[in-house]
């Protein structure tokens, strides 16, 4: 059987249910943003969730560890990242609960179906435009810059996938807050103020 962890990779402890994540230091590794998002998002019993721009799959795996949802899916454009995520799912024996799909966020509603899920999460590329980009096909560039999808693409496809009264959770940079609110209004996603936590 093929080894799940390759020689250039490492195994990181997620500090939940004994789950571990396979990461490649040459690709984008998760940070505190993903952890905070997975802690803030809530998936109720019987609900299904999709994580866009899932990278190495850390968010759907953490969501499974913290919630009682029916199923968690991750969508990732880059084949090498999707492969990492699938191997982490297999390593943690989560094949029945977590699925990783390889595909384009711009077509997410076609892949998963319209009004098909209760929850969408996303830790998207934060940076706009081509400033500082040396190679638009570089894995790190795709993870950090809007070269393959835009904020508009992400919010549009999320709105299409969400059922009535579904929930959209996104972590992003404050400098784009006005644009985020405007884009959410464009696609009829209402901002819900929660204090101190959506779990209360």
Question: What residue spans do the PLM features occupy?
Answer:
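Class I SAM-dependent transferase core
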Residues: 2-44
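Short loop/edge segments at beta-strand edges and connector loops
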Residues: 23, 102-103, 172
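Conserved SAM/SAH cofactor-binding pocket of Class I
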Residues: 40-122, 128-130
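Active-site-adjacent beta-strand anchor residues
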Residues: 52, 75, 170-173, 194
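Short amphipathic alpha-helical segments
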Residues: 86, 132-135, 181-184
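Mobile active-site "lid"/loop adjacent to the S-adenosyl-L-methionine
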Residues: 124-153
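Conserved Class I SAM-dependent methyltransferase catalytic core
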Residues: 148-192
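Conserved small/polar residues in nucleotide/adenosyl-binding loops
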Residues: 193-200
């Amino acid at each position: 059987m093929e080894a799940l962890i390759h020689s250039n990779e490492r195994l990181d402890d997620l500090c939940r249910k004994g789950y571990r994540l396979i990461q490649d230091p040459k690709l984008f590794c998760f940070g505190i943003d993903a952890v905070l998002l997975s802690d803030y998002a809530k998936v109720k019993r019987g609900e299904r969730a999709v994580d866009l721009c899932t990278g190495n799959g850390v968010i759907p795996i953490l969501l499974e560890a913290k919630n009682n949802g029916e199923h968690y899916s991750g969508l990732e454009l880059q084949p090498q990242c999707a492969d990492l995520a699938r191997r982490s799912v297999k390593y943690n024996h989560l094949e029945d609960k977590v699925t990783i799909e390889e595909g384009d966020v711009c077509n997410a509603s076609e892949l998963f179906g319209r009004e098909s899920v209760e929850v969408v999460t996303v830790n998207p590329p934060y940076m706009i435009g081509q400033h500082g980009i040396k190679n638009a096909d570089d894995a790190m560039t795709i993870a950090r810059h809007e070269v393959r999808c835009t904020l508009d693409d992400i919010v549009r496809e999320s709105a299409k996938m969400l059922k009535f009264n579904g929930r959209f959770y996104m972590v992003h940079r404050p400098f784009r807050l006005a644009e985020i609110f405007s884009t959410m209004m464009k696609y009829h996603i209402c901002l819900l103020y929660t204090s101190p936590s959506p779990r209360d």
